[in-house]
Amino acid sequence: MTDSVPTNHLSRRNAILVFVAFAFAYFLSALIRAITATLSPTLTQEFALSAQDLGLLAGGYFLGFAATQLPLGTWLDRHGPKKVVLYFLLVAVLGCVAFAMADSFSGLLLARFLSGVGLSACLMAPLTGYRRWFAANSQMRASSWMLMIGSFGMVASTLPVQWLMPLVGWRVLFWGLAALVLLAMLMVAWQAPHWQTVAAATDSGPAAKPGYGAVWRHPYFRSMAPMAFFIYGGQVAMQTLWVTPWMIRVAGFSPLQAAVGLFWLNVAMLTSFWAWGMAYPWLARRGHTADRLISHGMPLSFILLALIIVAGSGIGVWAAVAWALYCMSCTFISLAQPAVAMAFPSNLAGRALSSYNLLIFAGVFAVQWGIGLAIDGFRALGWQEVSAFQMAMTIYLLFTVAAYAYFLTTKSHNQAPS
């Protein structure tokens, strides 16, 4: 698609420095996002949380995240990544401090909501900037490597957190995270380029007026929407919450064993995103579009999740491996995010990305809380715990297959980017 805003590609050195600054902020965002999975046994015991409480607590972060996405896109397009991220990260600092000081479930939930709001720009802001600062053939790679950095954050949220817990406790941990977010603010303020606003793009001509309506009506965006909600959002919900309770309460892991399993799962995800960053430019040159890769790759995730469900408690020590393979197979859907951005001109990239992100994180919230509600509901009907987990996951699996089927039936009518 033709841009209506002139690009200003950075030199290699400046591009690396900008990437590092935003990547550190996103590292912290992913760490804080995923930390509830490692803390779930401790928080469940300390605050007497039910499955739906735990799902709501983890989902509260994503509710805050999703709530900002539509205004975030407009602000990014208008004010640029630097200014927006700095204001948002101030809210993230407040969220970390509030979590450290919380003495009730409602206090924890409010703190997670604030953290979600404050960290909600950490991926969309750099991706919006990369749309203008980086050459087109570098954008898929930059996106995959940002997700790889996020996986580093998720790795840091597992065993390192588990090791620190007996030494300092979870409250001190969140004070430290607040300090690191402040450091990230300094790095972004130092390295992020000034955002050039083009006045003519807002004042004249019918082409200057498109906004969220143009994004949500776009056939390519609409074909991707159900998968963003159920598949991408659901995979994040598994990785950041329900994998750990499954390993403990279905497969019989101890909390430490589950933390080790989650650590290696996140290492596997890190490796997957690194591999995508290396492989996608080569695949694209040979005609393998994002659509084609998603079409051919996603069924593997459905097969793996079905095997996990059917195996139940019989999967034993292989639970961590199975969940790692499932999450890795879901990384095909990560190709959709930069593809959606590239389907729009750069002056709409922020709104396109934030709209897509809204669907992802609304999906994370819905799946995290919905699975908790389903588990508690089936338990209330007298089901055994393992069976309740299996049925809740089966319902989720059916939704993901339906989302994929919708994509297959509509994609032939879309004009997806290469």
Regions found by a protein language model. Give the residues of each.
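Extracytoplasmic
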Residues: 17-51, 238-244, 367-371
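Extracytoplasmic gate region of multi-pass secondary transporters
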Residues: 36-37, 219-277, 364-372
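Helix-breaking motifs and short loop linkers at transmembrane-helix boundaries and internal kinks
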Residues: 48, 80, 101-107, 118, ...
